[in-house]
Amino acid sequence: MTHKFSYSLCFIISVCLLSGASSAQQLEIYIPENSTNVPEEKETDNILARCLATGLEEYCAGISLNANGTTLEANGPSDITLETFIIDLNDDTGTAKPRVTVKTDTGGAADTGQQTGSIDVKSAGIEIEFDFNSHKLRADQLDKVSVIATAFADDINAGKLYAIVGHTDGKGSDTYNCKLSAKRAATITSALLVGGAKAYLQPIGVGEVLLKDAANPANAQNRRVSFLKLDDNAETVINAFKALCD
């Protein structure tokens, strides 16, 4: 299949924003993947690379990124948050934008399968910090981004296609938030590519359309970037996410 879009990077990251001089707010960036629920054939000793390549809880549970960016397996809470984005292919609302929803994976019983006429895309989340209203990568986040780049440089991710989807909270105008989310996704994408990522990466901004906490639009958890691992339906998924800010 010939893809008629440019490739860029994809992974999930939670981003913390600084509001003023002293208070820090977190923004999450996620790395989603297609919900095939089939582990990759390749093996790797890089546990973060394995998590990003599969998006499965069994591979992502208990992963911890310590202060210097080292990846560790632990028995405590994971630094990876899993979400699923659901794209409705039978949307008959008559609007130009597709119907895309998001749900947090709670770690309970696995879904029996996606509904007919929809595409499910999984994501994995990692905390990355940005200053308030900024898309510039902070110096204190470079080590962590370097570790993520190494995971994308692993052979298990070589040649795979990922979309990086940037999100904002519900504050500000739709137009501004769409632009800011796109810039943050592009910043992370560039950093991963410079760090040696072997995957094809596509940055996309969706602004405030897909709030993680819709009941609290200003919640810092809504400010995130999602990384989606794409397969045969890549063009459909990318076009659906791009249309949310068109």
Q: What kind of region is each of these model predictions?
A:
Residues 130-165, 189-200, 227, 235-241:
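Periplasmic peptidoglycan-binding/anchoring modules of Gram-negative envelope and division proteins
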Residues 125, 159, 222:
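Short coil/loop residues immediately preceding or within conserved phosphate-binding loops
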Residues 167-245:
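Periplasmic OmpA-like peptidoglycan-binding domain that tethers envelope proteins to the cell wall
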Residues 105-110, 115-151, 168-174, 245:
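Short, solvent-exposed beta-strand/turn patches at coil↔beta or beta↔helix junctions
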Residues 2-10, 16-119, 246:
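N-terminal targeting leaders that direct proteins to extracytoplasmic destinations
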Residues 41, 78, 134-142, 178-181, ...:
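Solvent-exposed, acidic/flexible segments
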